[in-house]
């Protein structure tokens, strides 16, 4: 999935197996309808693991190589992102490409039973659209949300949903849809998707940092999630980024919660002298109003400070800055870089980061990527 199309020779070298062993394994997968042979594209090498140097195979010099790749239309999956106000859902193929439109339903009642009913409807909507387009019926559902999930099944902490007790969401959805269902942290899902199908492919380590309704962070090493029991409690949100910044609800002065929408709205209200929402701030920032622009620059410097802290401690190859409010980072990119440079050694390598456009469909796709990862084991 990560590197296809890829030759058997290259695959054998990556895995440290003999070509004979790889041929036997891939023959079984071809027979099972999981992968297929395809001509290798000329003059265009696909992504490979960082630092991997392919050894020359003189025995096959001059012969056209045949590549192997996952059969994209062999399976389909449904992915969903649960937000505080709505659920977004898409269907994807076996290589994580979105194959339907993004279906959205508003959450008017956040009780688990009502949310499951919405999930069932969205699963049906995505499945029907995929099947009408000739794709196979989805074989699994992946659902992501901001919170703490145990064993991919039970939601024990979901602050935006206000659930007062653990919810066995996986069991409830499986019973409602008849499909295997996994429940995942939303930030973890983004980083898994990036390492399977996106900018994290082949890298030794990769970070996703998000800000919007909250502040989130997830890290992979060698393509695998770095996990600990407490990681999804929003721990990155209370790292100091500005000693003169506003206090969060926990009383911390200048912690990373100042990057959240509510904190930005409160700070902007104080600056302009009357109550303002985050949407008011965003509108004024887009209109280049001086007071909003000043807060954009301050916010981006704070974000750069957080990025530098993460880069210095986790030492990732790349950081993806995402979230519904990540557009702010594009408005103040120079201040973001200044914040990074202020807390980065002058001789250290520049921090490699990217800021993709926000789209809830991509968050839903990321949940589907978790389902794919679970499906293939």
Q: Which residue ranges define each predicted feature?
A:
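Glycine-rich phosphate-binding loop and adjoining helix at the ATP-binding site
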Residues: 98-205, 331-342
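Glycine/GP-enriched mid-protein hinge/lid loop-to-helix segment characteristic of carbohydrate kinases
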Residues: 101-103, 110-115, 164-165, 169-283
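ATP-binding/phosphotransfer module of carbohydrate and carboxylate kinases, centering on a glycine-rich
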Residues: 1-103, 110-132, 136, 177, ...
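Short glycine-aspartate micro-motif
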Residues: 67, 77-81, 138-142, 206-210, ...
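Short glycine-rich anion-binding loops that position phosphate/pyrophosphate groups of nucleotides
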Residues: 146-149, 212-214, 325-326
